[in-house]
């Protein structure tokens, strides 16, 4: 087995060495739950990478959205170039779940656009878990949604070994059984082609490698790996396993058993509906279910086959589904990034899914067993955890209640020597004039300012007022799309404008080194946006600049404000003491400004100045070019860039549907 090995141009510094040692020791001693309480910009990802290197366990890193998961995956791939770092998120570029609205008698068909590249990465992730131990999978909450049985996925893999006596046609039938298609002309993922005694297979989890298997009579004579584009042989092997093209594949005997089980449930449910006088619902359910059964019998699957997953995997009613977590070996490590956001998100998934399914079941669109195609309940998620490290600058009440203080590991000192910003409270009387004076002082130094308000109206009025005073200012509200949001952040960094006004700026993940002032208006209005955790996160936006400062405008100091100020001052004191002891002078982080639309420049140059202004009739052509760029970015392991292009494609397609 290849061990985890971190490759980095720097060594752990500041608080990192003690954090790495304490967390690693906790894992080795069998501590089930630990917290890495790391301030913004202290290098938490590097610390976790070093912990993985120390404990040598297969690891799942859970992030609360696709973009963050892509960024983390990219970082871990740089730290672990010799190990398997995989990416597992929802493969839907666009997803409209099946639903029924009784008040208007409206049935909404499931509509989805599957990203083939992400589907490939999901297969690559599950295959890696069966073939090696040095695996890190970075995932979104998609990992708690139903997946097929890991036993079926592993047992149905087609094993090819040099010297084995096996009929070539038998192997071809096995490939069809696991949902590979024969195509001698269009050789792409999930396809195979046959040329005499040579069978070539393009595995489900591969991008640029295919398998060539050569027979001599009934004996496998040679197995080689080759580049499907050039045909160049890149290596030979004695054994290879071809894993199924779908995570929902099942053996023939299991499928027959599942069909009988679905028939039985259908008959039972039809009796119930007819007894209740719901004849329309009964007719609808019978027609839809029998169509699905026919499809499964004929071709092995149907649209919406996941709704029958309980029968296909042989589970009892109410039993939790198989998920990515079941593909991990027993001795695994879970890292929950930004746990104060991710934990509540995991907890909320089940209830939202359940209410939609209940309506579909009640009105005869689905069998009751469809409710068992679901995400894990939070208690089920907890049961599956072996060992976990919660990572956050502001851990939530759930983590803090469960983890004893001795297992809360602080990482306060930044490798750059940067301090948490000074926090000052000023009265609200004359606050706008005071803020204007502060903005002017920052603009003279070529620095940027973030202003956070409580209401949309206040943000809009403040933006207009500052514009009238000649300030280059923009307002970022919740309606701003992902791509435009990225462009706004980029323009702020480049100095196209100097002040960004918003309501919930902390959710944007705005780590902008040029920001030296964060102004919090109405800081004394208690609520979600002015709670201790939110205030600490907002204060952290000024922690990347050596001159970082936070001004809270308030007429009184609330408990949340006091706690946030005390915690910031505590961290700042620790950081100052460390800097004095080691003679470190804080320096603002130097971070290159990346062109967020760089990914689409070749397309944009040939079209409108803003790609989102593309006329509807030209959108299909532009989307086709963008998809090629996205595939190339993913191939280059630049998932952040690929995700940006994906968002542009999504918004263009939404615009076309609207037109």
From Swiss-Prot:
GO terms for molecular function: ATP binding; ATP hydrolysis activity; DNA binding; excinuclease ABC activity. Residues 25-414 form the Helicase ATP-binding domain. Residues 431-597 form the Helicase C-terminal domain. It is found in: Cytoplasm. A motif (Beta-hairpin) lies at residues 91-114. Residues 620-655 form the UVR domain. Transmembrane segments: none annotated. It comes from the Bacteria. Keywords: ATP-binding, Cytoplasm, DNA damage, DNA excision, DNA repair, Excision nuclease, Nucleotide-binding, SOS response. Forms a heterotetramer with UvrA during the search for lesions. Interacts with UvrC in an incision complex. The UvrABC repair system catalyzes the recognition and processing of DNA lesions. A damage recognition complex composed of 2 UvrA and 2 UvrB subunits scans DNA for abnormalities. Upon binding of the UvrA(2)B(2) complex to a putative damaged site, the DNA wraps around one UvrB monomer. DNA wrap is dependent on ATP binding by UvrB and probably causes local melting of the DNA helix, facilitating insertion of UvrB beta-hairpin between the DNA strands. Then UvrB probes one DNA strand for the presence of a lesion. Belongs to the UvrB family. This is UvrABC system protein B. It comes from Symbiobacterium thermophilum (strain DSM 24528 / JCM 14929 / IAM 14863 / T). The lineage of its organism: Bacteria, Bacillati, Bacillota, Clostridia, Eubacteriales.
